[in-house]
């Protein structure tokens, strides 16, 4: 009887563990991470003249999308690290640059985290924390950009800059 209760308790624990397990699946979206630069010391300066890491978001649709309340993070287990401010939108087929400089007190779109030069991930989530895009990137060799080719839909590769432009325009 004791053995049976022990097995039942173990089974219950396993079922509850499985049922409560959080999954981090990516849900397709019209808004994607299109390009990022984890090492930027001389290439593109932000509005403060600082050469910071950055992430480019691309809108695959032809309609403007309101990004108010979306989140960016460098860790899918902590998807709500930095919230995109209210009133932020991206036009159809347009680009949005967000500086991943660890200084969210600066005016404009500046996150409270930096991208690692050792390689890591960039994660875009909806306000309900549904992951819409997640990009894992290796350590770069020099000041290269990790870009999606073809633009918005393809796989990622290290290449020369296409800041705020189509990655197909080479």
Report each predicted region and the residues it spans.
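Intrinsically disordered, low-complexity linkers and terminal tails enriched in Ser/Thr/Pro/Gly
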Residues: 17-170
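Bacterial Sec-dependent N-terminal signal peptides
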Residues: 1-27
């Amino acid at each position: 009887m004791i053995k049976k209760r022990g097995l039942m308790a173990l089974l219950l624990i396993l079922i509850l563990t499985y049922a409560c397990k959080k999954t981090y699946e990516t849900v397709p979206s019209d808004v994607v991470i299109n390009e990022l630069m984890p090492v930027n010391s001389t290439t593109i300066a932000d509005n403060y003249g600082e050469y910071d890491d950055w992430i480019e978001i691309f809108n695959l649709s032809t309609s403007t999308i309101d990004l108010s309340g979306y989140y960016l993070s460098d860790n899918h287990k902590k998807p709500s690290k930095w919230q995109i401010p209210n009133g932020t939108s991206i036009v159809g087929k347009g680009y949005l640059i967000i500086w991943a400089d660890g200084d969210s007190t600066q005016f404009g779109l500046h996150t409270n985290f930096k991208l690692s030069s050792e390689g890591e991930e960039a994660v875009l989530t909806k306000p309900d924390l549904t992951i819409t895009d997640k990009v894992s990137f290796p350590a770069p060799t020099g000041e290269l950009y990790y870009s999606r080719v073809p633009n918005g839909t393809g796989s990622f590769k290290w290449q020369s800059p296409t800041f705020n432009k189509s990655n197909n325009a080479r």
